[in-house]
Amino acid sequence: EDGFQEAAAQAGGLAREARMTGPHGSQPTAARQGAVCAPMPAGKPSAELGEILQQVLQGLSRGEESGAAPRVAVLLDRPQPHLSNWLGPALGARELIVCSMRDEQDEQDGCPEAEPVEYSGLIGLARVVGFTNQVDLHQALATHGRFDVLVDALTHSPGMRATSAQLFIGIVRDGGYYVAIDGAALGESLNTAGLITRASRSLAGLHGAAGELSGDERSYGEQVAALTVLDGGVVLRKRGDGFVKLRYAETPPILSARYGESWGRSLETLPARVTPLEVIGVTNNPGLCAKRFPRENRIPETSVLEYRDVCVAPRQVLVKDHLLLPNTFRLATTKRLVNTALKELNHYYAAPRVDTQSAPRREGTFFYLDIEYNRHFGHFMTEVVPRLYAWKLARATHPDIRILTNSRADRGRPPAYQRILLEAYGIDDDLVEVITSPVKVDTLVCAMPLMQNGRFADPALASTCHRLRDGLLERSTPNDKPQRRLFISRKPDMWRECLNGSQVEECFARRGFTIIRPEGHSIVEQARMFYEADVVAGYIGSALYNIMFARRPIDVIGFINQSYLATNEYLICSVLGHRLHLFYGDEITDCRGKDCEGRDLGVTNRDYVFNIERDGDQLDELLDSLEETWGES
């Protein structure tokens, strides 16, 4: 992105081409009197450019859509209306989108924000959109859909030309063309060498050349069906379709620009805000805690969106045409959007692993609760529960709305614990509809979750937890002798195993803690036990998420290795007012490769040992203080 911004700054004094509509449907304004934005003088296209176009035209004539007028996009970082005017007719384009780089100071430099087509010298039905950086360009291309031909006439450095091709070939349809015009053909210096080198490396790697390819390099090579190097530039023929990854904030404007009001609507939007986080109590590694956990709770703008005419595929894949809607991504505010049910192409594009275009239609209006890891208790608690807040709004808006999810368990129904949790929240099981393959639906209500691992937790999540807890408690009776102190153990040989866990648990047992394994109890029984506890200790992981059901703010003691990155317990504690005391163990770097379920331990899930000799006294002091706080009950 920095390279795009640098190029925009260098072009600061240059005129922009007109924009008939902006990236999100903005309309042009009249040119100001006295503005001087003269375009480059038109010239006859060179033989080199003609050769490139001939290569593309021949390919289009042989394709599956031969005879159809192509949709063409042109990327420019300076005004070249003569080039755009020549490319459109030469390719027989039915639509020409000119993406023109602009500098943010252009208006102050005498160039109007949007100029009429006559002023810029463009002809025909060309539409011009401006961009200042890589993200702008991504959004502009997403706004205008897939293209048969994308012509890159940017005059960036060779490295940036290579990056542009690797990223934005994703917007070209299967069988289409990405054309990079060399700077020399435009009167500039040669600048496609990096593109040729990078594309060739990816292709060679797929055919057994020495050297390791990254995932993105491999995906790039798989998208290039043919690479042709000509005097005037480079032609890449595209293989496969890319789907655009969308983020929450950019989705409504992009959908509105593409579909008008027919895409759907926003049912609710809550403003972004920042709240303090004061969660950590005692720890044996304050430096790591300060580095690992956020000190501010940066809650993004939160929305409940109602989509129309979308396709839903199992494992949280949500598609409209060739757009991957933001509810596809469980970690939707991270730098890169990823879903393991998708084939990654690059930062901006991915592709479903199943056919979403010919999916059958499922009648009805639905509330979306599917998740990527649909049988995992921890993911359900941290990714479905934080979406339940919108159920009341969805039901008020659509009284006949149903739940849409997917499952591979319990004869096509969600796992029993999920059904019980939903019923406790007030969602009857007969309202839950399960899919096992892609379906298209007329209306789908999707809530952005109130919590995201590693990022934020909205305090509003507390009311959802309380409603869920109270619904579960109605299904059980109080214990005659409630256990006020719980230690949550784990099955042996799971990943992140505390190898001296028996010693740790013995220490807590001597202090009056009851050792339990939650999986041996129903979710209703678990809710009751956690509700009655004043202190909960155990190994960091999904079994501790039941602290959501506590009756009041409690003390939580967690043990974990030093590389584990998830922060769910921390965020849950922040919402409910719990105090988290965290003890890090010493990792075993040469440990086993897989756990008892066949999962790779990798770096973040290594086994560890709690160093009792070094940290035992600190733990004892904490337990002494908690006895004073909570008494001996």
Predicted regions and their residues:
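Class I SAM-dependent methyltransferase Rossmann-like catalytic core
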Residues: R32-E65
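SAM cofactor-binding core of SAM-dependent methyltransferases
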Residues: I52-R127
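The feature primarily captures lumenal catalytic ectodomains
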Residues: P79, R201-S633
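A short acidic, Gly/Pro-enriched loop at the edge of an enzyme's catalytic core
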Residues: L141-V149
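A short, conserved alpha-helix within the catalytic core of class I
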Residues: P158-Q166
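Helix-to-beta-strand junctions that scaffold the AdoMet/dcAdoMet cofactor pocket
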Residues: V172-R173
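Conserved beta-strand signature within the Rossmann-like core of class I S-adenosyl-L-methionine
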Residues: G176-D182
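Conserved class I S-adenosyl-L-methionine
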Residues: A184-R198
